[in-house]
């Protein structure tokens, strides 16, 4: 997991984004947040990389590869699996 880095693309008015952020807070998971409403560069990056400007979206960079994970519950499951092993 050392080579992985994460960014959560979100908006302040998105309930599904809030769900992911609440989970991150409860688990003390610190990931860079990118607001696609207030940051046009973030919106463009999400659109170019992920193929759609839909939030929430977790950008997962692992070495040279980048994956884009949409859907709040999928993001929560992924974070739960990734960070529960490192917290054991």
Model-based region annotation:
Residues 9, 59, 70:
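Residue-level detector of conserved, well-ordered beta-strand and adjacent loop positions
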Residues 12, 35-38, 64:
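Structured beta->alpha junctions
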Residues 16, 20, 42, 54, ...:
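Amphipathic alpha-helical interface surfaces
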Residues 29-42:
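Thiol-based oxidoreductase modules, predominantly thioredoxin-like and allied folds used
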């Amino acid at each position: 997991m050392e080579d992985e880095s994460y960014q959560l693309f979100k908006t302040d008015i998105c309930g599904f984004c809030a769900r992911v952020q609440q989970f991150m807070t409860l688990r003390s998971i610190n990931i860079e947040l990118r607001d696609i409403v207030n940051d046009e560069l973030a919106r463009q990056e999400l659109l170019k990389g992920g193929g759609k400007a839909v939030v929430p979206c977790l950008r997962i960079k692992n070495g040279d590869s980048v994956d884009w994970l949409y859907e709040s519950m999928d993001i929560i499951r992924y974070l739960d699996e990734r960070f529960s092993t490192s917290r054991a």
